[in-house]
């Protein structure tokens, strides 16, 4: 039974998404349906957690908009995600960045990972 589930899930996994990590700044382009119209909305922020694996994998992006923290959780392999762009690589030492919720201003920034 497990092999059947894995085979079905493997067909539905997306391979066009980049490999990003916790602490990275990403732009997530999401399809939004309003009535009969469909448009693409961008949500930019820091990845504070990734959960599960396989088809059920989710990630949460946090940003501060007008002084209010906004967190949004996306299913990784959902068809509503048009594309994901990595704008900055972050250098962190934790798997979950929940401590950013309590920080304000520059203290809420993540160090940038410099690659050569």
Curated annotation (Swiss-Prot):
Q: Example GO molecular function term?
A: structural constituent of ribosome
Which key words tag this protein in UniProt?
Answer: Ribonucleoprotein, Ribosomal protein
Question: What NCBIfam families has UniProt attached to this entry?
Answer: rplS_bact
Q: Does the keyword Membrane apply?
A: no
The source's superkingdom equals: Bacteria
The biological process GO terms on file are: translation
Q: Which InterPro entries match?
A: Ribosomal_bL19, Ribosomal_bL19_CS, Ribosomal_bL19_sf, Translation_prot_SH3-like_sf
This chain belongs to the protein called Large ribosomal subunit protein bL19
Q: Which family, according to UniProt?
A: Belongs to the bacterial ribosomal protein bL19 family.
Q: Which GO terms describe its cellular component?
A: cytosolic large ribosomal subunit
Relate the protein's function as given in its record: This protein is located at the 30S-50S ribosomal subunit interface and may play a role in the structure and function of the aminoacyl-tRNA binding site.
Source species of the chain? Clostridium botulinum (strain Eklund 17B / Type B)
């Amino acid at each position: 039974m497990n092999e059947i589930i894995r085979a079905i899930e493997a067909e539905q996994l997306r391979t066009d998404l980049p490999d990003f990590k916790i602490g990275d700044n990403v732009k997530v382009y999401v399809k939004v349906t309003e009535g009969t119209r469909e448009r693409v909305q961008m949500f930019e922020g820091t990845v504070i957690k990734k959960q599960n694996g396989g088809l059920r994998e989710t990630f949460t992006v946090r940003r501060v908009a007008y002084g209010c923290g906004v967190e949004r959780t996306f299913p990784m392999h959902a068809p509503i995600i048009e594309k994901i762009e990595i704008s900055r690589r972050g250098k962190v030492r934790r798997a979950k960045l929940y401590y950013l919720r309590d920080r304000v201003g520059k203290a809420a920034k993540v160090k940038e990972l410099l690659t050569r």
